């Protein structure tokens, strides 16, 4: 008989099953001989297969001489022994996936084989072990091994088991077993594929390709053919480097490629679609050129890859890392790459084979696309593979992930290849606990089937029944034990589910309790927000615990020794601002009959107006009041015993009536009766700006009735003497007096002064006065408020701390002009007058730059300022700074690296030696200090609020480089923008973040203390002092930004607050603003003084030259330079007042009137 071919596995299987052939030494097929002594001498050395076949033949010969029953029993025994011996795992079986199929000797089943078999099996095992040990290095060298499996796995060699080929056979009862059919096929059992040696049933391809260790295929011809096969380019290169550089520069990254939207035009490339990005095209072209820039850096490993992802995957073969874990909960497998994990999940945890061969006549289906590709290459050839590659089916490259529609494993002995392809059973997705219960039930069912199978086979192996009873008893005991274990597991899962449900309910209750606690804390914080408006913005702290304060004064005193709470101006990141309505209800005699604060929904008694003298009488002594539970810094002196009854009354009980009936001081001009309120609503009123154009030293140039107080809001402020600090509250009705809703949202100045005196805090007075400047648009009402503060400070002889003082009336007047004149900062350059005022500084700059031969170019244009050309022509005949000095400063105007600013910060055309730089430096310092006090991270405040240039807000200023430069030198605050957004920030989390940030700030402060130099006026002299610059507490920029977007009134107040600090600093330090000068003379000399100081600091001029230039400036101004440079400042100019906007505070009935108002001489206070 002719030996069958090795390429016909079905014939090999059938022949091996019949026992007709046995493989000898892996070379040919021979007829097995009988195991007798005479023939075995001339036979080849006994191998594992020959020994088993010889044992079977010897058993057959021995049973011929016995009884038929004994013959049948011995036949069953020999067949059973062969089955269990062939079921042992092969030598390549790993520890990770152990498969143990041993005969159930422990169940009581005896193995009483024939004497010949018992004697031959040990003899066959000895040469088998020798053959396995000797053939192991050869097999290891013939098969490419994976380093990862070599390190993480251990090869187990079974000495009594031959290396045989296994396949799956289905028994009549439905279980799957393994039988030997030859060599070199790995075991697949229990639904898990142990593996297959490379090269099995594979023919070598006609067009060899380079296959990477992870499936990346590149043409091998690319490594030898160094020809650029791009469209219309066939250049040949001597090395790969030249080819790669040519393709990248000339084709991939060329200008023409942008027009083609990243398309590969390599000859023969089947990529018909464009790439979304350039890097994708670069990686793709490496498949054509053969470039592999990613090399393994491990010693002795020369692997190279074209993709960085493949190199990272390859590195895991050295490190043993397996980050890709199986996504099924009951599987603990892990892999080094996602592809192997997907193959494992599709093959092990699913019976589906969605990848079917599309070639006609082939019905093969596979679980993953790589197996399908290998099948097409090995079986159908390279031509069919190329065709299939070009016509990919829709599901060709889809990675199959665990699908809830896939049925669970149906049997512990099942195999995925036994299920029919393209079967999708309509089952719903079970829950997690339901799925676990199903798996336990199925496992128990299959265990029962296995026990029953062993019990049935025990009867066949022991016909006499000697071991059947023992096997049945052992099977029942094992079944009962297994059932008990599964039941315990089910109970544990049920208890776990109940615990999870209880935790969810407890979490809901905790959230509700936390919400209630936060609401109570917010109410307490709102009660304390008034002090924060007038305090120096102390460090932030967590919310207070809920408690009921006895009264506000004692609570505020207690706050001196406890961490302060967030205030309204601080814009806390976790507590939204809720305006409160503080009010002091009064009786006719001025005594307090209720609490000092009340919430908006509580109606209080209306204050009563009483007329009293305009000043506080000095003959009325007021006994000091000892605060409740006095604490640091200093307790007031205790009053005499006779005045204890009076100590409970407010210290300024007559001051409220004084404010309600205050009259104009004698220094003011007589006033006209106040206008009646019009029908203007709050929204209309807030959208207008009171344009009281006032120059320094003059009175209000009122354009309505000549009174200077025509606003209903001004009337209310003037009549009631109140200061609004609680924010805007929607009011639908008119506000004709200080009663009703008006009194609900006002805070009496007497209460402010009382708190300032009780705590000896001068910042309360100054901040309240600054707030009054913003909220009081009428200058007359503002004067009433200022006189009240001044009289009380003089009467009480209030002592301010170092560097603080009560502002003078000219300073208050100037700041009031900034915010209540016609200069509207939300509409930059809205009118001709505004544009003229802004041009005062720039015309001076252009005048200094008017020497065109040196290269100075003007900044302003004709469209920007229609009087520019005339002023330049008229001012070109005058000189302020010597020509040679201007020449020396020309080079430094655009190159000032030594001043800490880059060139982008300097204004083009500015040739004054850094005048603008000096002014902007001071503005930035003050602006940052104001932003820190407002708890804002200033590097991003300009983006969130609009750039606050010069203190006027919403300006188009390009000087952002200084902010970036300063940002690098500033302590970084807590920034939550990159962290996960949490809806509710608990007090514990906030405290941890706050303490960590505070520790960092303190450490930075100890290393690099920041010092600021400020000036103040004391007794008519300018005094400089130095103090440590305190750091602001950490703040969440994200929350601040969202709050400013949700509440526009906060943004408006913040811009006013920042602008106030900038202008106040300019006033105190005599720094002129480039947007507005108080008067032309002071502006002219101020700029010249700054220029001389800058030149003197840089060493460009001496003291003598500085004095000479000062005389030159005085001489130039005396030559009527002002009339030539700024002709529109002359009041005799016809068009100067014609373009002024009419006051928005006039009556609505006069809105259509176009008559020019009468010109009146400004009054001076």
Curated annotation (Swiss-Prot):
Cytoplasm among keywords = yes
- What does UniProt give as GO cellular component? cytoplasm; nucleus
Entry keywords, A to Z: Cytoplasm, Developmental protein, Differentiation, DNA-binding, Metal-binding, Nucleus, Repeat, Sexual differentiation, Spermatogenesis, Zinc, Zinc-finger
Do you know which Gene3D superfamilies this protein is assigned to? Classic Zinc Finger
- Similarity remark: Belongs to the GLI C2H2-type zinc-finger protein family.
Q: What is the protein's species of origin?
A: Caenorhabditis briggsae
State its location(s).
Nucleus; Cytoplasm
What's the record's remark on domains? Only isoform a is thought to bind DNA. Zinc fingers 3, 4 and 5 are the most important for DNA binding; removal of finger 5 almost abolishes DNA binding and prevents the selection of binding sites.
Q: Where are the zinc fingers (C2H2-type)?
A: 226-251, 262-288, 294-318, 324-349, 355-380
Effect of a null allele: Null mutants exhibit strong masculinization and male mating behavior. XX male mutants are infertile, produce sperm from day one of adulthood, but by day three of adulthood, switch from spermatogenesis to oogenesis and produce irregular oocytes. Mutants display early somatic gonad precursor lineage defects, whereby Z1 precursors divide with reverse polarity and Z4 precursors migrate prematurely. Most animals rectify these defects to produce normal male somatic gonad.
What name is this protein filed under? Sex-determining transformer protein 1
